[in-house]
Amino acid sequence: MKPSIVLYKSIPTDLHQRLAQHFTVNSFDGLTPDNQPELLAALQQAEGLIGSGGKIDQDFLQLAPNLRAASTISVGYDNFDVEALSQRGIALMHTPTVLTETVADTMMALMLSTARRVVELAERVKAGEWQESIGDDWFGVDVHHKTIGILGMGRIGMALAQRAHFGFSMPVLYTSRRPHEAAEQRFGARHCSLDTLLAEADFLCITLPMTEQTYHMIGREQLAKIKSSAILINAGRGPVVDEQALIAALQDGTIHAAGLDVFEQEPLPVDSPLLTLRNVVAVPHIGSATHETRYNMAACAVDNLINALTGTVKENCVNPQVLITH
């Protein structure tokens, strides 16, 4: 008899069929067991879980007593209580490599569109307001040869540094727990303190995940140290930045502009002051949102779950210590 799994996000047909070759697949639209009796029943039998989003904590895990593996279609896993999963011997799988290049592309797009005011100016053209050459009050700022400061020199940070260094001749500063030899050799990147990065960067680019250590890492005190001409780009996690402090800094000119793909609350509330600011480019968490990358992420998550439930995991496990007991 095939193991039972719960799939709580739509995936391409061929990937669904691949899961069905190995498991009895119970498909649902999201995780709301209180409102879906069928989901509650499926969770009771499920050995595997695959999807994205949802809150997977102690209370949820009590609904799935037979769960052995969870596979998230994402690189981030802050919605999972990793300690609770580990205590129960449940392997948590994620997709850390397949979205790297696409997220770096998104960050470059935010840098360019924010610096050159692409969204504002495109909206003016569409509104029929382009009647003469624009004045200097609508000019943007250069990206090339400006200094980029990267918070977090992981895979995405490296891909962003590559684009900045080779594509735009940008000096690269970065912060990380330890120096990154490859970044320094390939891109001439300079490892520095957060204070130095804040003071020198023209573009402050955040690629960090959400942890207890990174929560509100960039707040009012840090924003006050940034150049008034600097632009903040966040495609890591929203809560890394104190959003209220950022709003104030954008309103009073403490910093020049911001390009944001992530927010403290998602979807972004319709009454958020960020939506009223001309110096903000806000997009709906699209970092990995291309057809190709989303397919590859789903395929990776499918393979991850198959590997976890068949005892063949070689990579992509957040808590590999649980595999020893399997």
UniProtKB/Swiss-Prot annotation:
Primary location group: cytoplasm
Gene Ontology MF term list: glyoxylate reductase (NADPH) activity; hydroxypyruvate reductase (NADH) activity; hydroxypyruvate reductase (NADPH) activity; NAD binding
Reaction catalysed by this enzyme: glycolate + NADP(+) = glyoxylate + NADPH + H(+); (R)-glycerate + NAD(+) = 3-hydroxypyruvate + NADH + H(+); (R)-glycerate + NADP(+) = 3-hydroxypyruvate + NADPH + H(+)
Enzyme Commission (EC) number: 1.1.1.79, 1.1.1.81
Subcellular location: Cytoplasm
Oligomer and partners: Homodimer.
Family: Belongs to the D-isomer specific 2-hydroxyacid dehydrogenase family. GhrB subfamily.
NCBIfam families for this protein: PRK15409.1
Protein name: Glyoxylate/hydroxypyruvate reductase B
Organism per entry: Yersinia pseudotuberculosis serotype O:3 (strain YPIII)
Organism lineage string: Bacteria, Pseudomonadati, Pseudomonadota, Gammaproteobacteria, Enterobacterales
